[in-house]
Amino acid sequence: AKAVYGRWWVVHLWVEGFFEVFATVVAAFLFVRMRLLNEKSATLNVLFATIIFLSGGILGTFHHLYFSGTPKAIMALGASFSALEVVPLVLIGYEAYHNYRLSGKKEWVKGYKWPIYCLIAVAFWNFLGAGIFGFIINPPIALYYMQGLNTTPLHGHTALFGVYGV
């Protein structure tokens, strides 16, 4: 059980923790520079992502521990904190997309069309891969039947687009 916990500790804190914060900071910075996101919203979401990483990153690890005999209440707590990790980047992507649609007719926006689409796609894939597909495979009953099936790589690979881009 200690080896399983240690393995998922590394995976969770590196992949789901650091990458989420990094992607949120980079997207927020670029969207602020392109005037698609105001600084206050960017700052709040980056701080929210950092707080979730620091406080919930450790607790979020518990959703990986199904086969090590962890009680269901602990796994549910971990799944809840893990699900919160996608919220800041999704909020940034949503606000940037909304502002992009409002300012889409301006000339400078046309020059940045594809980078903007890429960053918005990052937020979308993060929501779909880490959020939706991750939450589908996290409940204990789902882990009992689906662990190791194609739903696990589906979650991992779609979440990968949500960090590294499309």
Language-model segments: residues:
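Hydrophobic cores of alpha-helical transmembrane segments in multi-pass integral membrane proteins
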Residues: A1, V11-M34, L44-H64, G78-Y100, ...
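Juxtamembrane membrane-water interface segments that cap and precede transmembrane helices
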Residues: K2-V10, Y144-L154
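Intrinsically disordered, low-complexity regions enriched in small/polar residues
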Residues: R7, R33, S68-G69, M146, ...
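Active-site-adjacent structural elements in folded domains
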Residues: W9, A76-A79, G104, Y144-M146
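Solvent-exposed interhelical
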Residues: E39
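Membrane-interface helix caps and helix-loop-helix hairpins in membrane proteins
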Residues: H64-I74
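Membrane-interfacial, low-structure loops and terminal tails that flank and connect transmembrane helices
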Residues: L102-Y112
